[in-house]
Amino acid sequence: MDETAQNRHASPAPLSPVRSQTPDVAVRATAHRALAAFFAFGTFWGAWAALVPAVREAAGASNGELGLALLFLGVGSLPAMIATGAALDRLGARVVPITLLLMAAVGVLPALAHSVPHLAIAMLVVGAASGTADVAINAEIAGLEAATQRTLMPLAHALFSGGLIAGSIAAGLARQAGAGTAPLLACAAALIAASAYANRHPYPRVSHARPRRRIRRTLVAVGLVCALAFLIEGGIENWSALFLQRELGANAAVAALGPAAYALSMVVGRLSGQRLLPRQRSSRILTVGALVTLAALVATSAAHHPAVAIPGFAIAGAGVALAAPILFGAAGRGASDADRGTSMATVTTIGYLGFLAGPPLLGATAAAVGLRGSVLVLAAAAAVIAAAAPRLQLR
């Protein structure tokens, strides 16, 4: 390799996508185990989503009390994310199996709650454990991308989305057959425990470091755009069925197709990113995806029949599907081994504010102007993403 090529290889491009390169077999095996952790993590939360009504009933909580208890998920997760970033920088990937084991150990707690205060405490603990695992496995994938020079983040998030679907369906069917809430959550937690054991070996460190100063100037902006993407994700996931029922008069079965179509489109969109990201600029993909989401949500807000709204939610999901993988991957790859954990924690923590802000923001909008207005709020978030994407130094 001549000197020019060496310099070009060593020159750090901030927040840039990686190109395909055949990885070492051992590193590839490590990547497969890390990807399996995403599926296990998604399976747990899919099972949880299907079991929320049973958990609410066991705790004797009203809808309002359940909403308050669920708020403790975020209260616990955000500080835990920040702490995990520092731990990753200091201890490295050995933190990953510890966080997964912690999540597995506490995952069953919500099913054991028999009062609202107990449920709130359980959600606080589970939120903290989930936050640590979330940052750790995303940082692990980002580190593997740096080590292998391959795009992995879209596949990781696709597996998480696939796990959500699989866990929700499996838990729903098992619940219908008479299975208890605690055993079902314990089974989902056992998958996470198995992934913890599988991920007990850290990924190999990459040899070159990237300048921390250049990355820091972009992290907050990346996190804020991620928050808008998560606002859209959470909004469609949690409000699409309600929109179909209350605004369009759909029955419960038809209304359920809204979040289902959205979830499926997220999986397909993220899987497509495995081939698309190495071939196109990340900023262009993010911009075009946001514009697609914007158009789909505007059309959905004006829909008068579920046959229009359901595809609208699906197309919106496809448009936003690659936002989080692009932003998480860029933040992690743009950092050195010495500060990748903090970089991932910063973007993840800011990003998850979108999930927390979504329910009160969309709820207040729905109360003031109706659910069509809430969908337009999501469209506005997509417009901001489209405007901001070219300025994020993504390549």
Model segments located where?
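Short amphipathic helix-loop junctions that connect adjacent transmembrane helices
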Residues: 50-64, 238-254
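Helix-loop junctions at membrane interfaces in 12-TM secondary transporters
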Residues: 111-122, 302-311
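Intracellular juxtamembrane helix-capping segments at the cytosolic ends
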Residues: 132-146, 322-335
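Structural signature of the two symmetry-related core transmembrane helices
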Residues: 95-108, 284-299, 376-379
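Helix-to-loop junctions at the C-terminal end of transmembrane segments
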Residues: 79-92, 175, 269-282, 366-367
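Symmetry-related core transmembrane helices of the 12-TM Major Facilitator Superfamily/SLC fold
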Residues: 182-199, 373-391
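Interfacial helix-cap and linker-helix signal at transmembrane-aqueous boundaries
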Residues: 55-56, 87-88, 173-178, 244-245, ...
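Conserved MFS/SLC helix-loop-helix module at the cytosolic interface between two early adjacent transmembrane helices
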Residues: 79-111
